[in-house]
Structures are given as C-alpha cells and as structure tokens.
C-alpha cells in the first residue's frame, strides 16, 4: 500500500495501466469531452473544493479529471469496497487528485478513506449512495458551513436523501442527478441492463439461453436487466411489490410471480430494488441446486448473506467472485461478488457511452450548485430541463443525428387553446 498525505493507493506504479484505461474510455465520452473543453477555458471551479465518493474506475476517473481541469481541488474515496480499480486510482493520484481507495478495503478502511477525502473541506460533494452526505451529517458537522450542496448519482442514494429531507436533517441542497431523464432512462436501463449481464457472464462463463431468470424489481434498472435477459434467450420472471410495475412487466411480455413461487423455478436471480432482504431464508430453502444469485442494487443487503451463511453447512469459492453455499440437503447456491454490485465488482461497470451522459450531468450539477449557492434550500432538487436537453443534443450530434425542429406555426398551435374539433 502506497500512502502519502495526498493519496492512499495499492501501488502507485500501476498508474500507466490506469492512464491507458482512462484514455480509452475518454474517446467514447463526447459529451463530457465537450464540457471539459468548455471548463478548461472558463475554469469555473477555480478555488473550489470538491469531494467525491464514487465507484473509482475509468469513467469516473475521467469525470474527476474534468473537474480538476476546471480548476477544482478534487478529493475522492470509493463508494463500494469492491468496485475500485487499483490502476485507475494510481493514475488519479499521479494526476493530482487526492484519492484514497484500495480494492477490497474493509469497512473500517472504507470510512477512514472517506474521512480523508472529506478533510479537503469540500464546497461541493458528489455522492453515490449517499454515504458521504450521511457521514457529514452524522460525524463531520463542522464541515457543513463550507458546503454549498451535493449531487447524488443513484436511485438508492436519492431514496436515502429524500428520507433525510422528510426527517428534516438535511443541512444543504441536494441535486438528484439520478432523476434527470438523460440519467435514468439510459444509465439505469441500458447501462445496468448490459453491464449486469457482463458481470454475470464474465464471472460464471455459463449459458443464459434456456434458463429461467428472476428479476427482482422492475424499476428502470430491472427493466434493462429483464430486456437483456430476454435478448439472451432466457425466460424472464419479474418479482414486484408495486401493482402498476407488475402489470407493466406482464404487458411487456414477462412472467410475474411472487418471490416464493419464483424461488422454486429460477436458475439465475438478480435483485435491483434498493431494499433489504428481498431474497432470504424461506426463498433459499426452495431454490434449485445450482441457482445463481446476483445483485445489481447499490448495497449488499438485497440478498441476505446472513441467512445464506446460517443455512450453509459448507462455504467455498469455486471461482473468483463466486461463493458457494452448500445446504444440508446437498444443494449448492452460488452468490456472485459477495452480493455487491455485480456489474462493478465483477466487471467494468456501465459502457463509456452511457456514463458519458451521467457524468456530464454530474459536472453540470456541480456548476449549478456553485452558481446557485445560497439560493437553494436544504431540499432535494432535480436539474433544470434545459441541462437535460443540452446533454441529449450534444449526444445526438456526436452520433451524427439531426432531429426535427418545430415551425413557428407549430409552436403557436401548441401554445393556443382556441383550436378544437
């Protein structure tokens, strides 16, 4: 482990490998490239301190370097102990980002590193799962006067932050980047859909076609996972608690069951709910021999590991990132990536082209917080529609796509109430 006052990484000599990774993904992130060019010229974050808790891999690295190029002092820690890529973190440290993260860090190190990142006394926080905001509110209240606001990347994080708002404990404004159209319609659906299966297939090297895939949760992430499972030839079963989403899943052509019924027939189970213990003891007891369990939600609580451990008579690791739990009756259940985010713990996360839009939003959210400091209440906000549309237009242009424009006649018609039947 290489540590100084400005970084703590596994091995700083890994930096050249990380630099190559960052350079590769940057070529497929035209929206963030566009914003970076603008930021480099204007330096909107000169003198601004930004602390981030993110999955520290190549796409997030390009975001952090974009903010640094904009003049910010940037610090960062991991948002998940297993998603860190050590070579990328080394490259960030070499580039002058104050970064503290090591793949496989334990819980104590996780929070120690987060506190180190917070020692920069941030004006802006970029969060992924709301752990950094929560830590500030509970343990680092002395930082609050310096904080103008924070942005949140994930559905899980936004749920936590809205709960904080409801309880009246928020002390600064939050921008829910996750709730922007160019985030959840693309990142959550197409990004999660592809990267979750990338993680599962890389880890298991098993066939998906012909299997029963149980998707627990039919939000935008669940929709993407189910869509790609069908494309791979699986029979897809959706488990939901929301009657409207359950009905939508059925109308989309998927089977819908409760968890007890799905547990009996599933070959691969994937959770994407943001809630706790969605698959637990009574479900494990019904599963087939060889059932595979994976999680696509932010925290490792959706599949009950304590229940698996209590039921198992033997625990082993047949392959990297796979834990085998042997039951008393001889059945074997396989948990991928310790129940953590399978797409990041067992693969490289979302495709660069998808994160291009999400991280463009994060960069603009940071600028929005700076420009509106002192004018926003301690509430959860969504970015203005014009920022969403700006990101979409730049993305379309990078794809060589030109869209139609309303004529003046059409605009006038849409604004009028006088024309009827």
From Swiss-Prot:
SUPFAM superfamilies: Formate/glycerate dehydrogenase catalytic domain-like, NAD(P)-binding Rossmann-fold domains. One of its GO terms (biological process) is S-adenosylmethionine cycle. Substrate binds at residues 128, 153, 183, 187. Belongs to the adenosylhomocysteinase family. Its EC number is 3.13.2.1. GO terms for molecular function: adenosylhomocysteinase activity. Pfam families: AdoHcyase, AdoHcyase_NAD. It comes from Thermococcus kodakarensis (strain ATCC BAA-918 / JCM 12380 / KOD1) (Pyrococcus kodakaraensis (strain KOD1)). The keyword Aminoacyl-tRNA synthetase does not apply. GO terms for cellular component: cytosol. It catalyses: S-adenosyl-L-homocysteine + H2O = L-homocysteine + adenosine. May play a key role in the regulation of the intracellular concentration of adenosylhomocysteine. Keywords: Cytoplasm, Hydrolase, NAD, One-carbon metabolism. Its cofactor is NAD(+). PROSITE patterns: ADOHCYASE_1, ADOHCYASE_2. It is found in: Cytoplasm. NAD(+) binds at residues 154-156, 188, 217-222, 240, 296-298, 343. Pathway: Amino-acid biosynthesis; L-homocysteine biosynthesis; L-homocysteine from S-adenosyl-L-homocysteine: step 1/1. Its main location: cytoplasm. This is Adenosylhomocysteinase. Binds 1 NAD(+) per subunit. The gene is ahcY. CDD domains: SAHH. HAMAP family: AdoHcyase.
């Amino acid at each position: 482990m290489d540590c100084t006052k400005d970084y703590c990484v596994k091995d700083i000599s890994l930096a050249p490998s990380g630099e190559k990774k960052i350079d590769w993904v940057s070529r497929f992130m035209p929206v963030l490239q566009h914003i970076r060019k603008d930021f480099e010229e204007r330096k909107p974050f000169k003198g601004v301190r930004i602390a981030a808790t993110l999955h520290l891999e190549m796409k997030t690295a390009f975001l952090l370097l974009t903010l640094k190029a904009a003049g910010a002092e940037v610090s960062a820690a991991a948002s998940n102990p297993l998603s860190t890529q050590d070579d990328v973190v080394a490259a960030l440290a070499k580039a002058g980002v104050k970064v503290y993260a090591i793949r496989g860090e334990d819980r104590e190190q996780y929070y120690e590193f987060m506190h180190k990142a917070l020692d920069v006394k941030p004006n802006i926080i970029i969060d992924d799962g709301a752990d950094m905001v929560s830590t500030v509110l509970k343990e680092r209240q002395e930082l609050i006067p310096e904080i103008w606001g924070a942005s949140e990347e994930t559905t899980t994080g936004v749920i936590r932050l809205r709960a904080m708002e409801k309880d009246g404990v928020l002390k600064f404004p939050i921008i829910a980047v996750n709730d922007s159209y160019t985030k959840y319609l693309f990142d959550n659906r197409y990004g999660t859909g592809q990267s979750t299966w990338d993680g599962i297939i890389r880890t298991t090297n098993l066939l998906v076609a012909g299997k029963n895939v149980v998707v627990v949760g039919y939000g935008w992430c669940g929709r993407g996972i189910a869509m790609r499972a069908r494309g791979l030839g699986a029979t897809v079963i959706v488990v939901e608690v929301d009657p409207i989403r359950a009905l939508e899943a059925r109308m989309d052509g998927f089977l819908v069951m409760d968890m007890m019924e799905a547990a009996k027939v599933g070959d691969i189970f994937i959770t994407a709910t943001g809630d706790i213990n969605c698959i637990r003891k009574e479900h494990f007891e019904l599963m087939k021999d060889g059932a595979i369990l994976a999680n696509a939600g932010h925290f490792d609580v959706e599949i009950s590991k304590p229940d698996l451990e209590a039921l198992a008579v033997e625990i082993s690791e047949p392959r990297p990132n796979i834990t085998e739990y042997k039951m008393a009756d001889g059945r074997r259940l396989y948990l991928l990536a310790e129940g953590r985010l399978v797409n990041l713990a067992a693969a490289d996360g979302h495709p660069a082209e998808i994160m291009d839009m999400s991280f463009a939003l994060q960069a603009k959210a940071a600028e929005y917080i700076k420009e509106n400091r002192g004018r926003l209440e301690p509430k959860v906000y969504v970015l203005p529609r014009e920022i969403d549309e700006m990101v979409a237009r730049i993305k379309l242009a990078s794809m060589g796509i030109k869209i139609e424009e309303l004529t003046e006649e059409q605009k006038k018609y849409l604004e009028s109430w006088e024309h009827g039947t």
